[in-house]
């Protein structure tokens, strides 16, 4: 028997909560500087209650071949990956009109 979604009450394989959550997110992707002048890509605006940030960060890190972390609801990736991150988020189902770079 499949698990039940706690939000909508439907079985997990029929649940559309995460897809709806992806469409409603307003995401900002920007770059910043860290110690020793290293660049990082910062992704903010994703609701950590609706989308698993750790899982999304792991996906992005593997696709971009870089390190990164999740701190205070913000994903930080080592290096400047603004355009590639936007493409990957669109592939994952996020609304391209609600992603600001």
From Swiss-Prot:
Alphabetized SUPFAM superfamilies for the sequence: eIF1-like
Domain of life of the source: Archaea
UniProt keyword Protein biosynthesis, yes or no: yes
Single annotated GO MF: mRNA binding
Short name of one Pfam family: SUI1
UniProt-listed Gene3D superfamilies: SUI1-like domain
GO biological process entries: formation of translation preinitiation complex; regulation of translation; translation reinitiation
Keywords: Protein biosynthesis, Translation regulation
InterPro entries: DENR/SUI1_TIF, SUI1, SUI1_arc, SUI1_arc_bac, SUI1_dom_sf
Sequence similarity: Belongs to the SUI1 family.
HAMAP family: SUI1
Descriptive protein name: Protein translation factor SUI1 homolog
Organism for this UniProt entry: Archaeoglobus fulgidus (strain ATCC 49558 / DSM 4304 / JCM 9628 / NBRC 100126 / VC-16)
Taxonomic path: Archaea, Methanobacteriati, Methanobacteriota, Archaeoglobi, Archaeoglobales
């Amino acid at each position: 028997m499949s698990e039940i979604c706690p939000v909508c009450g439907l079985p997990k394989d029929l649940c559309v909560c995460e897809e709806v959550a992806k469409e409603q997110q307003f995401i900002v992707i920007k770059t910043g500087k860290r110690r020793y002048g290293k660049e990082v890509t910062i992704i903010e605006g994703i609701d950590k209650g609706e989308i698993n940030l750790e899982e999304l960060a792991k996906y992005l890190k593997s696709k971009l071949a870089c390190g990164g972390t999740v701190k205070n609801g913000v994903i930080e990736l080592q290096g400047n990956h603004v355009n590639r991150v936007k493409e990957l988020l669109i592939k994952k189902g996020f609304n391209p009109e609600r992603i600001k770079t």
